Amino acid sequence: MDDQTDQQSSQYTAECLAFIQTHLMAFYERYADDEGISLTQVKQRVSKWDMGQWKQAISQMGDVSDWPDDAKQRMTIVGFIAGIDRSHLLDSIISLGVIKMTVSNQKNITHRLQLDGKTEARRMGDFFDLTSKQSKKVTSIITDPETTKIWSQNLWVDSDKMAGDVQYLVNQHLKHGMSLNDLNDILASHANPKQFKPGQSAADRISQMEFNARRIVRTESARLKDEVNMVTYRMKGVTKVDWVCEPGACLKCQGIEELGPYPINGAPDIPDDSHPNCRCSKIPHIENLNRSYF
């Protein structure tokens, strides 16, 4: 499941980079001279051709009717900014690519979390023989808006910062005159960690958003499963729980496990008391319990 989610996130990153690359190259081919393209050349009034590029970029967003308010608000803002001058229009086009990628990641994460939550709720329902009313209480956690509120807000904050960083990289090169080689360098991605330079490569900076989306999926999936489990345990009268480390768990989680069992209302939370990407779990504390099902 992680591989499928990761592949989708990688696809969104590639689409965002291709979108930005296509439009930057179009502006370069339109306005560059023998010395490249400079900030002076883009600090001009928006032309008819520029507006055509903007309309094309907007059309590439597709149907935005089901986009979240966070995305629609940002689209409105960048629409106003785009009309200031050519430089701001370029910034706004970059923002559009990032916004679309963030919407895709948000939908991908939401779908994955709901799937994981429902799977865990079904597992708990079967194992503990929950009544229909009890099952509804458990599944209500999955659809609670508060479940997605915090991580989605953080996703958009990170998205805004990343868009700003990419815009900064482009504008820094424009200040000194951007050659075609400079443009290619900005857009070059590096799979080798030793070559990874998010402070110099827009592609590498955008890739950081992909890594962030992966972290959110793993972290929030673990949080949701933990909440589903703990609500179920309380309903079934469980008084103590054991912390069960995932294979290859870190020293922190091993220490948490060794300090168990914990009272149901005093047990460490996943991931708040462990760490992002934690895949440990908690099970009812029963002497000589066979843990294989959990």
Predicted regions and their residues:
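Acidic, glycine-rich two-metal-ion catalytic cores of nucleic acid-processing enzymes
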Residues: 201-294
